[in-house]
A protein has these predicted regions:
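Mid-domain Rossmann-like dinucleotide-binding core that forms the NAD(H)/NADP(H) cofactor-binding site
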Residues: 115-191
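NAD(P)H cofactor-binding loop motif with strongest signal on the N-terminal glycine-rich segment
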Residues: 145, 214, 237
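Glycine-rich beta-strand-centered segment in the early N-terminal region that forms part
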Residues: 18-34, 46-88
Length: 269
């Protein structure tokens, strides 16, 4: 089959062996692929988690039709239209574990539309709903809201009934567009008083939930901008893998600080 493969120089289309599904995997004939930040990193020769380097097939999200099933796969059959979060998807065929595979609606979603959803939708549903436990009427801040995953977060927060949705972006042009995706207030996380802006918008209380894709330089101000008994969900580290952290403020505000990733989750999870 054909696949887009990382080489020492760039990427190129090569003929490679068609994958065989493991017991917990579906084999999909790929109809459309997504393109996200991690794909660009891998295509550029960098690593994303355990993925990367010469010989790697690019691609993390895709859609298509199930053409093969592992022995442990549940709730899927050959011919199902699906979208998947997996690896090596810029190819004619790709595999994904059934826990990160979702059926596509038959009537109102194309393969192309579906291929844009897995990474952003799975990531932010897991962050906002499963771990963040956002309730109707609560307030939320999305750090890094102008990314594809961030834009999905804004929409999920609105759909779940958040009374105030704040989004951050360091790019003025992108920041000005956040309202189109559900942001009631847009802030610049490089502004030294952004946490005060959040406090002003919440009557001094702080937000109930922060979805943090930045970490690093915003860590302490996140604590300042979070309500007592609020939650911070650590999704990404675009602002740095380490930073100052005021443990006293964390304790005083009794903040629940939760890290999330799919890399250490079981198939059933």
């Amino acid at each position: 089959m054909r696949a887009v493969v990382v080489t020492d120089q760039a990427v190129e289309v090569q003929d490679v062996k068609k994958p065989e599904p493991k017991p917990n995997e579906v084999l999909v004939q790929v109809r459309a692929c997504g393109l996200n930040r991690a794909d660009l990193m891998v295509a550029g020769g960098m690593a994303h988690g355990a993925t990367g380097g010469a010989g790697t097939i690019v691609g993390m999200e895709f859609s298509g039709e199930v053409v093969g099933l592992g022995s442990e796969v549940k709730n899927f059959k050959e011919g199902d239209r699906v979208m998947c979060h997996g690896t090596e998807s810029w190819a004619d065929y790709a595999v994904a574990d059934w826990g990160r595979t979702v059926k596509i609606p038959d009537t109102n979603m194309s393969f192309e539309q579906a291929a844009t959803l897995p990474v952003s939708l799975y990531t932010m549903h897991n962050a906002i709903v499963t771990n963040g436990s956002l309730q109707s009427g609560e307030t939320v801040l999305i750090q890094g809201a102008s990314s594809g995953v961030g834009l999905m977060a804004l929409q999920i927060a609105k759909l779940k009934g958040a009374s105030l949705v704040i989004g951050s972006s360091t790019n003025e042009e992108r920041r000005n567009k956040l309202a189109e995706f559900g942001a009631d207030l847009a802030i610049d996380s490089r502004d030294t008083n952004w946490a005060d802006q959040v406090l002003d918008a919440t009557g001094g209380k702080g937000v109930d939930l922060i979805i943090d894709q930045l970490s690093g330089y915003v860590a302490n101000d996140n604590l300042k901008a979070t309500a007592i008994m609020g939650r911070i969900i650590n999704v990404g580290r675009l602002g740095g893998f380490s930073g100052d952290f005021d443990f006293d403020l964390h304790a005083a505000r009794r903040i629940h600080y939760i890290g999330v990733t799919f890399r250490t989750r079981s198939i059933d999870e």
